[in-house]
């Protein structure tokens, strides 16, 4: 099946419509991703069909959350090659997007993608979540934080919840073992000012891959001691 139809049919299966211009933007993104991937390690997924499903449809599946709206400010924490932030920006062009990554080479790649796709209101930050989450320019400034499964949930919430303003949401993509992770992370979520408001299982179109979508609402401010200094959240997660 050609890539264009995977995107169109896949989005329809996930419950929303993607237009031809958005499809073209994502296909351009795929071309740049695979070209840059020959020079640096951006993704282990290089088969075109797999890029469509495991990167693009996977990222866009966040739209299934009832809490994600088409406008507002969003930070993608540890965005890597731009997932899920850039596909969400393509779908919701009014989102003001910040892409945070600790590797400068990846940030340069993200700048090129955004320029080639004609994306506006995209901000690029080279840094670590633990440090940026303590800076006034980023702390509790965003309606949404998003992240793919870059760490266990009790670590991830310390990276991400400090960025979210009270009344905003952390939208997190995790593997299928979500209930157990939530149980192990309940105290961390509460301490950091969050409350679980949505969880759902999603099977990606054209695959047997099932993952979980978790939404945590920020209901009170994060105590100033969080996030702790770089490396501490992963070495000593909040119990």
Curated annotation (Swiss-Prot):
SUPFAM superfamilies noted in UniProt: S-adenosyl-L-methionine-dependent methyltransferases
Domain of life: Bacteria
Binding site for S-adenosyl-L-methionine: 78, 83, 129-130, 148
Keyword Cell cycle: no
Annotated compartments: Cytoplasm
Its EC number(s): 2.1.1.-
Enzyme class: transferase
GO MF terms held by the record: rRNA (guanine-N7-)-methyltransferase activity
One term under GO cellular component: cytosol
Keywords carried by this UniProt record: Cytoplasm, Methyltransferase, rRNA processing, S-adenosyl-L-methionine, Transferase
UniProt record similarity statement: Belongs to the methyltransferase superfamily. RNA methyltransferase RsmG family.
Function: Specifically methylates the N7 position of a guanine in 16S rRNA.
HAMAP family, sorted: 16SrRNA_methyltr_G
Stored NCBIfam families: rsmG_gidB
Name this protein carries in UniProt: Ribosomal RNA small subunit methyltransferase G
Species assigned in the record: Alkaliphilus metalliredigens (strain QYMF)
């Amino acid at each position: 099946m050609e890539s264009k139809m995977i995107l169109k049919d896949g989005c329809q299966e996930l419950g929303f419509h993607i237009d031809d211009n958005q499809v073209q933007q994502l296909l351009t993104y795929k071309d740049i991703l695979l070209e840059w991937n020959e020079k640096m390690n951006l993704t282990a997924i290089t088969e075109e069909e797999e890029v469509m499903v495991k990167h693009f449809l996977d990222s866009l599946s966040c739209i299934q959350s009832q809490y994600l709206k088409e406008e507002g400010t969003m930070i993608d924490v540890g965005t890597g090659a731009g997932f899920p932030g850039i596909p969400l920006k393509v779908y919701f062009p009014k989102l003001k997007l910040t892409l945070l990554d600790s590797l400068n080479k990846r940030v340069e790649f993200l700048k090129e993608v955004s320029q080639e796709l004609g994306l506006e209101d995209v901000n690029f930050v080279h840094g670590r979540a633990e440090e940026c989450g303590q800076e006034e320019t980023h702390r509790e400034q965003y309606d949404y934080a998003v992240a793919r499964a870059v760490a266990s949930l009790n670590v991830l919430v310390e990276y991400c919840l400090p960025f979210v303003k009270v009344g905003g949401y952390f939208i997190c993509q995790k593997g299928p073992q979500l209930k157990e992770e939530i149980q192990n992370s309940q105290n961390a979520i509460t301490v950091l000012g969050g409350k679980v408001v949505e969880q759902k299982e999603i099977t990606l179109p054209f695959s047997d891959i099932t993952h979980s979508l978790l939404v945590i609402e920020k209901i009170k401010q994060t105590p100033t001691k969080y996030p702790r200094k770089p490396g501490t959240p992963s070495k000593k997660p909040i119990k």
